[in-house]
Amino acid sequence: TTFVAGFVGTSNLLRGQVARTIVGDGGTFTVRPEKIRIADPEARPAGDEIAASGRIRQVVYLGPDTRYHVALDAGGELVVTQQNFATSSMEALAQQGRAVRLIWKRQHNFPVGDGG
């Protein structure tokens, strides 16, 4: 359920028209922040992937990870968490305002019920 998705750590929810635009179904879906990758705006997803265009609204550098809040062109927002293998805090923070395409494997997109 959406309650469980929110209760078990950070999770992104795609609902209604936003889900219909991105996933092709108007239900409610969840995708974990660490399963999403940030790509250039012109990047094309593979056949087993889902993509959403947007703009990085906020960057939170957390030492080993960076959390990106991305405002979606379709509406809503997704949070993406990336490990900082070779990214400095200044490089991460400089991404704010950048247009991006978010891409994730279809298998990481889970339908959830709206019950509590």
Task: Name these PLM-found stretches.
Residues 1-8:
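Conserved beta-strand-loop-alpha-helix hinge in the C-terminal portion
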Residues 11-13, 20-116:
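Non-catalytic connector elements of ABC transporters
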